[in-house]
């Protein structure tokens, strides 16, 4: 009676476990293809209980009469004013005319969305906190652990690299379709025919920081699938749509960006941001968190960190599952 995820249905826990195994196996396929294929095959074998296939089977936790809870995202949105619509996801959704944008974020009285760029204190003014679009979340909103759309995108990538059966196009479009269903919006058939690219951010688009601009369309992709595209472009499409479907699971989206190099992201406003964590000037995001300073005074094993990491304890040191040929984002 206290199972807040599956309400006592053990079969749904099996689906979650196998879906998590699929996620982990796909994550390592660029580094250990044989290991990835072994566990992808196991996870997708119906005799092992199956994976999450439908919206009804997704793993989520939400407030119930048995155990009232508050969505953990809510305080960052309402109490601290720290969570607002980012210009990266806005550029994709606005460029694609994505109907999920209105399901996920608030707009002003004229129907306009007000995003914030990856910028400095100019974007942290009280006006920005008040006027920028907010995530649509309340105390009763579920916290999603793993959704059906993510499983479809995982299967699409596995099929693309011949690690599992299935048609990459069909699985990609299935992932987009499930994401629309998860967010309660229609129009997926038209969306899958869109050939437009994400918006380039110009100074006129951002009311709370008019000094920022970034060209995001160069080398980018549209939602429409093309069988004639290279596998690299197909991967970019899969991960870009997966990024949109993962919202608000920011950690998983960050992980996929680090692993694959997709989707392309808006650059930091401060062009030396990455240098400060030991990286190259043209990089976009950190690769990892550093260990807490206290660890160096209390943990005798910290001397082994450079060898285990393959680099120093810096934010720019790549983790082991990052692909060797990860593309660099065009300038």
Residue spans for each PLM region:
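Structured, solvent-exposed acidic/aromatic patches
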Residues: 1-187, 228-233
């Amino acid at each position: 009676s206290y199972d807040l995820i599956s309400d006592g249905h053990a079969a749904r826990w099996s689906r979650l476990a196998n879906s998590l195994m699929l996620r982990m196996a796909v994550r390592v396929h660029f580094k250990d293809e044989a290991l990835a294929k072994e566990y992808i095959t196991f996870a997708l074998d119906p005799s092992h209980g199956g994976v999450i296939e439908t919206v009804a089977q997704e793993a989520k936790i939400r407030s119930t009469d048995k155990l009232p809870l508050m969505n953990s995202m809510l305080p960052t949105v309402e109490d601290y004013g720290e969570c607002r619509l980012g210009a990266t996801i806005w550029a994709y959704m606005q460029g694609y005319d994505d109907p999920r944008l209105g399901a996920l974020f608030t707009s002003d009285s004229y129907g306009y969305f007000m995003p914030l760029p990856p910028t400095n204190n100019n974007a942290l003014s009280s006006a920005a906190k008040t006027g920028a679009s907010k995530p649509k979340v309340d105390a009763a909103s579920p916290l999603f652990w793993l959704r059906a759309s993510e499983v479809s995108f995982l299967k699409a990538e596995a099929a693309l690299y011949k690690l599992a059966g299935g048609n990459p196009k069909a699985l990609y479009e299935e992932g987009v379709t499930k994401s629309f269903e998860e967010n309660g919006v229609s129009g997926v058939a038209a969306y899958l025919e869109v050939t437009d690219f994400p918006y380039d951010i110009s100074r006129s688009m951002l009311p709370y920081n008019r000094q920022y601009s970034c060209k995001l369309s160069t080398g980018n992709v549209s939602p429409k699938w093309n069988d004639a595209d290279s596998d690299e472009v197909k991967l970019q499409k899969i991960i870009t749509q997966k990024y949109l479907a993962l919202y608000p699971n920011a950690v998983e989206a960050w992980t996929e960006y680090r692993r694959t190099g997709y989707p392309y992201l808006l650059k930091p406003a401060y062009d030396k941001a990455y240098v400060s964590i030991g990286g190259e000037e043209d990089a976009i995001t950190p690769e990892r968190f550093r260990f807490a300073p206290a660890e160096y005074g209390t943990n005798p094993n910290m001397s082994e960190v450079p060898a285990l990491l393959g680099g120093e304890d810096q934010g720019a040191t790549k983790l082991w599952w990052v692909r060797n040929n990860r593309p660099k984002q065009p300038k």
